[in-house]
Amino acid sequence: MQQYKHDFIEFALSRNVLKFGEFTLKSGRQSPYFFNAGLFNTGRDLAKLGEYYAKAIQASQIDYDVLFGPAYKGIPIATTVAVALANQFDVDKPCCFNRKEVKDHGEGGNLIGSPLKGRVLLVDDVITAGTAIRESMEIIQANNATLAGVMIALNRKEKGKSELSAIQEVERDYGCQVFSIIDFDDLVSFLERSAQYTDYLPKMREYREKYGIK
């Protein structure tokens, strides 16, 4: 596991964004862990979050022209990622996000920031059902742009209603790759190396066996 992945897990744990225990998900599944990126909610937290996204984007070597953050959660993520890329890697990329409600006055339209054109890297926290991606694709296509890829914080790597995960369905439907700062296997690797959290390993392995993608 790359060092930035390990550091991101520790960062998420320190902010209670990542928790191990027993949790009931919206799907009704009993999960041995929970991830809520909304708890990265201070200036310092958001700055660090942007740095981890930037490191993962650079590591992915994805070719893109513009960052796009889908409303609402993707908006602060895209903003802090754009700043981190410029500050850390001298990569100065334009940034764009959408409104949920279309304005008919002022600058109008449903996009704020740079024009949405060329190869678009969509940034968000997680992909649960893929709904936000599908809505974003409509916006990207309406602007004659192309989805270059997606970067999220966590890939749960678990099956949805079919044998595929929501992420695999997105990759299949739109012919793009979904990258993540960390995934479920990284969490397991972290637990295997951490004396503090080893008690959670059996439940995590059991969950992967039951719901993990093959």
Curated annotation (Swiss-Prot):
Keywords: Glycosyltransferase, Magnesium, Pyrimidine biosynthesis, Transferase. InterPro entries: OPRT, Or_phspho_trans_dom, PRibTrfase_dom, PRTase-like. Transmembrane segments: none annotated. Its EC number is 2.4.2.10. It is an enzyme of class 2 (transferase). It catalyses: orotidine 5'-phosphate + diphosphate = orotate + 5-phospho-alpha-D-ribose 1-diphosphate. GO terms for cellular component: cytoplasm. Catalyzes the transfer of a ribosyl phosphate group from 5-phosphoribose 1-diphosphate to orotate, leading to the formation of orotidine monophosphate (OMP). This is Orotate phosphoribosyltransferase. It comes from Glaesserella parasuis serovar 5 (strain SH0165) (Haemophilus parasuis). The lineage of its organism: Bacteria, Pseudomonadati, Pseudomonadota, Gammaproteobacteria, Pasteurellales. The gene is pyrE.
